[in-house]
Amino acid sequence: MNRKILRAGAVALAFAAMPLLSIANETSAKDVGKKFDEAGTAIKDYSVEQRDEAVKSAKAALDDLDAKINRLAADIDAQWDKLDASARKKAYESMDRLRRERNDAAEWLGALKHSSKEAWGDVKNGFSKSYDTLASSFAKAKEEF
């Protein structure tokens, strides 16, 4: 049952991650964290006049993270039969948290596209915080699995 739920989550993430970007096979959790910290911080530097660039940058960062999450889900799925009950539960919980946090970041991305000038600063900060949370959770999950 848990395997079916994990696969369903992986499929949902795959659909959310179109188009997927290529993934480096050997990336440490620290490298991942640093790269994603830079992406989240970069969004904060855009002015409302640079909205299109900010959205493009945010989408690319989110797409890249989606691809890495999908790869992690595939790796977990490939090892599922070798995991004990505790590790399976942890994997399921990690993927569920990533899915929820990814959805939150996607909502902020939508807000970036449509925010008013007055709300721009709050929306940028909201996306950055949401993205940073997601990236941190991914780095932690990658390190655990």
Regions flagged by a language model, labelled:
Residues 1-11:
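Bacterial N-terminal signal peptides that target proteins for export
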Residues 10-20:
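Bacterial N-terminal signal peptides
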Residues 22-145:
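Polar-face residues of amphipathic alpha-helices and helix-prone low-complexity segments
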